[in-house]
Curated annotation (Swiss-Prot):
UniProt name for this protein: Flavin prenyltransferase UbiX
Gene of this entry: ubiX
InterPro entries the UniProt entry points to: Flavin_trans-like, Flavoprotein, UbiX-like
Single GO term (MF): carboxy-lyase activity
Reaction catalysis annotation: dimethylallyl phosphate + FMNH2 = prenylated FMNH2 + phosphate
Protein origin, superkingdom: Archaea
Pfam families, per the entry: Flavoprotein
Native source species: Archaeoglobus fulgidus (strain ATCC 49558 / DSM 4304 / JCM 9628 / NBRC 100126 / VC-16)
PANTHER family: FLAVIN PRENYLTRANSFERASE, FLAVIN PRENYLTRANSFERASE PAD1, MITOCHONDRIAL
Assigned EC number: 2.5.1.129
Protein task: Flavin prenyltransferase that catalyzes the synthesis of the prenylated FMN cofactor (prenyl-FMN) for 4-hydroxy-3-polyprenylbenzoic acid decarboxylase UbiD. The prenyltransferase is metal-independent and links a dimethylallyl moiety from dimethylallyl monophosphate (DMAP) to the flavin N5 and C6 atoms of FMN.
Record family assignment: Belongs to the UbiX/PAD1 family.
Residues annotated to bind FMN: G9, A10, S11, S35, S86, I87, K88, T89, R121
Protein backbone atom coordinates (compact mmCIF):
# COMPACT_ATOMS: atom_id res chain seq x y z
CA UNK A 1 0.00 0.00 0.00
CA UNK A 2 1.21 3.46 -0.89
CA UNK A 3 -0.62 6.70 -0.13
CA UNK A 4 -0.18 10.45 -0.37
CA UNK A 5 -1.38 12.47 2.62
CA UNK A 6 -1.49 16.25 2.39
CA UNK A 7 -2.02 18.69 5.24
CA UNK A 8 -3.35 22.17 4.43
CA UNK A 9 -3.83 25.18 6.67
CA UNK A 10 -7.34 24.35 7.85
CA UNK A 11 -8.05 23.49 11.46
CA UNK A 12 -7.90 19.80 12.34
CA UNK A 13 -4.20 19.07 11.92
CA UNK A 14 -4.39 16.19 14.39
CA UNK A 15 -6.55 14.30 11.88
CA UNK A 16 -3.78 14.41 9.29
CA UNK A 17 -1.16 13.40 11.83
CA UNK A 18 -3.25 10.47 13.08
CA UNK A 19 -4.00 9.35 9.53
CA UNK A 20 -0.29 9.21 8.70
CA UNK A 21 0.33 7.28 11.92
CA UNK A 22 -2.52 4.83 11.24
CA UNK A 23 -1.51 4.14 7.65
CA UNK A 24 2.13 3.55 8.57
CA UNK A 25 1.07 1.30 11.47
CA UNK A 26 -0.87 -0.75 8.92
CA UNK A 27 2.29 -1.14 6.84
CA UNK A 28 1.65 1.49 4.17
CA UNK A 29 4.19 3.80 2.61
CA UNK A 30 3.03 7.36 3.24
CA UNK A 31 4.25 10.28 1.18
CA UNK A 32 3.36 13.40 3.14
CA UNK A 33 3.21 17.01 2.01
CA UNK A 34 2.35 20.06 4.09
CA UNK A 35 1.50 23.58 3.02
CA UNK A 36 3.12 26.59 4.64
CA UNK A 37 -0.20 27.37 6.33
CA UNK A 38 -0.43 23.78 7.64
CA UNK A 39 2.89 24.20 9.43
CA UNK A 40 1.56 27.30 11.20
CA UNK A 41 -1.75 25.67 12.14
CA UNK A 42 0.02 22.49 13.26
CA UNK A 43 2.04 24.45 15.82
CA UNK A 44 -1.03 26.41 16.96
CA UNK A 45 -3.24 23.34 17.47
CA UNK A 46 -0.88 20.58 18.59
CA UNK A 47 2.41 19.83 20.28
CA UNK A 48 3.72 18.55 16.92
CA UNK A 49 5.72 20.32 14.25
CA UNK A 50 6.96 19.70 10.73
CA UNK A 51 9.80 17.59 12.11
CA UNK A 52 7.34 15.09 13.53
CA UNK A 53 5.55 14.77 10.19
CA UNK A 54 8.92 14.12 8.54
CA UNK A 55 9.62 11.46 11.17
CA UNK A 56 6.39 9.49 10.80
CA UNK A 57 6.04 9.66 7.01
CA UNK A 58 7.95 7.43 4.63
CA UNK A 59 8.90 10.56 2.66
CA UNK A 60 8.06 14.19 3.29
CA UNK A 61 7.77 17.11 0.87
CA UNK A 62 7.07 20.83 1.08
CA UNK A 63 4.29 22.23 -1.08
CA UNK A 64 6.76 23.88 -3.48
CA UNK A 65 8.59 20.62 -4.29
CA UNK A 66 6.71 20.20 -7.54
CA UNK A 67 9.19 17.56 -8.79
CA UNK A 68 8.07 15.09 -6.10
CA UNK A 69 7.34 11.66 -7.60
CA UNK A 70 3.59 11.80 -6.92
CA UNK A 71 3.29 14.99 -9.01
CA UNK A 72 3.30 12.61 -11.99
CA UNK A 73 0.72 10.06 -13.03
CA UNK A 74 3.49 7.55 -13.64
CA UNK A 75 4.03 7.30 -9.87
CA UNK A 76 1.69 4.56 -8.73
CA UNK A 77 -0.13 4.97 -5.45
CA UNK A 78 -3.36 3.69 -3.95
CA UNK A 79 -4.92 7.04 -3.16
CA UNK A 80 -4.52 10.48 -1.70
CA UNK A 81 -6.13 12.18 1.28
CA UNK A 82 -6.06 15.90 2.00
CA UNK A 83 -6.58 16.06 5.75
CA UNK A 84 -7.50 18.67 6.77
CA UNK A 85 -8.54 20.24 3.47
CA UNK A 86 -9.02 23.99 3.31
CA UNK A 87 -11.58 25.54 1.00
CA UNK A 88 -8.69 27.29 -0.76
CA UNK A 89 -7.13 23.94 -1.61
CA UNK A 90 -10.47 22.40 -2.57
CA UNK A 91 -11.10 25.33 -4.91
CA UNK A 92 -7.67 24.98 -6.50
CA UNK A 93 -8.27 21.28 -7.12
CA UNK A 94 -11.80 21.84 -8.46
CA UNK A 95 -10.67 24.39 -11.01
CA UNK A 96 -7.36 22.81 -12.03
CA UNK A 97 -5.13 25.44 -10.44
CA UNK A 98 -2.21 23.12 -9.79
CA UNK A 99 0.14 25.83 -8.51
CA UNK A 100 1.64 23.77 -5.68
CA UNK A 101 2.42 20.14 -4.97
CA UNK A 102 -0.81 19.48 -3.07
CA UNK A 103 -3.09 20.74 -5.85
CA UNK A 104 -0.94 19.10 -8.54
CA UNK A 105 -0.91 15.73 -6.77
CA UNK A 106 -4.68 15.87 -6.26
CA UNK A 107 -5.19 16.79 -9.91
CA UNK A 108 -3.02 13.85 -10.98
CA UNK A 109 -4.88 11.54 -8.59
CA UNK A 110 -8.19 12.49 -10.20
CA UNK A 111 -6.95 12.22 -13.78
CA UNK A 112 -5.51 8.78 -13.06
CA UNK A 113 -8.86 7.69 -11.54
CA UNK A 114 -7.37 7.00 -8.12
CA UNK A 115 -9.08 7.64 -4.80
CA UNK A 116 -9.00 11.23 -3.58
CA UNK A 117 -10.47 11.95 -0.14
CA UNK A 118 -10.91 15.58 0.92
CA UNK A 119 -11.57 16.15 4.63
CA UNK A 120 -13.14 19.59 4.26
CA UNK A 121 -12.77 21.70 7.40
CA UNK A 122 -15.00 24.72 6.98
CA UNK A 123 -18.32 25.76 8.48
CA UNK A 124 -20.67 27.22 7.66
CA UNK A 125 -20.51 26.77 3.91
CA UNK A 126 -21.87 29.33 1.45
CA UNK A 127 -23.30 28.42 -1.95
CA UNK A 128 -19.93 28.94 -3.68
CA UNK A 129 -18.30 26.42 -1.34
CA UNK A 130 -21.10 23.93 -1.95
CA UNK A 131 -20.83 24.32 -5.74
CA UNK A 132 -17.08 23.75 -5.53
CA UNK A 133 -17.57 20.61 -3.43
CA UNK A 134 -20.26 19.33 -5.80
CA UNK A 135 -17.87 19.90 -8.72
CA UNK A 136 -15.18 17.88 -6.91
CA UNK A 137 -17.62 15.05 -6.20
CA UNK A 138 -18.62 15.01 -9.88
CA UNK A 139 -14.91 14.74 -10.76
CA UNK A 140 -14.61 11.65 -8.54
CA UNK A 141 -13.36 13.04 -5.24
CA UNK A 142 -14.80 11.82 -1.95
CA UNK A 143 -15.94 14.81 0.09
CA UNK A 144 -15.43 13.77 3.69
CA UNK A 145 -16.21 16.45 6.26
CA UNK A 146 -14.85 15.09 9.55
CA UNK A 147 -18.24 14.93 11.24
CA UNK A 148 -18.25 13.60 14.78
CA UNK A 149 -19.86 10.19 15.31
CA UNK A 150 -21.60 10.06 18.66
CA UNK A 151 -23.15 6.61 18.14
CA UNK A 152 -19.78 5.22 19.21
CA UNK A 153 -20.32 6.77 22.66
CA UNK A 154 -16.89 8.39 22.68
CA UNK A 155 -15.24 8.88 26.03
CA UNK A 156 -12.66 11.39 24.79
CA UNK A 157 -11.68 13.63 21.91
CA UNK A 158 -9.12 10.95 21.01
CA UNK A 159 -11.99 8.47 20.52
CA UNK A 160 -13.64 10.90 18.08
CA UNK A 161 -10.36 11.43 16.23
CA UNK A 162 -9.66 7.69 16.01
CA UNK A 163 -13.11 6.96 14.59
CA UNK A 164 -12.89 9.74 12.01
CA UNK A 165 -9.39 8.75 10.90
CA UNK A 166 -10.44 5.10 10.62
CA UNK A 167 -13.29 6.11 8.34
CA UNK A 168 -10.97 8.21 6.18
CA UNK A 169 -8.54 5.29 5.89
CA UNK A 170 -11.44 3.08 4.88
CA UNK A 171 -12.35 5.55 2.12
CA UNK A 172 -8.81 5.06 0.82
CA UNK A 173 -9.53 1.33 0.57
CA UNK A 174 -7.73 0.26 3.73
CA UNK A 175 -9.38 -2.36 5.90
CA UNK A 176 -9.62 -0.92 9.39
CA UNK A 177 -11.14 -2.42 12.51
CA UNK A 178 -13.22 0.20 14.30
CA UNK A 179 -16.59 0.48 15.97
CA UNK A 180 -19.40 0.73 13.44
CA UNK A 181 -23.09 1.46 13.71
CA UNK A 182 -25.21 -1.39 15.01
Amino acid sequence: MRFVVALTGASGQILGIRLIEKLTELGAEVYAVASRAAKITLKAETDYDEGYVREIATKYYDEDEIAAPFASGSFRHDGMAVVPCSIKTASSIAYGIADNLIARAADVTLKEKRRLVLAIREAPLHSGHLKTLARLAEMGAVIFPPVLSFYTRPKSVDDLIEHTVSRIAEQLGVEVDYRRWG
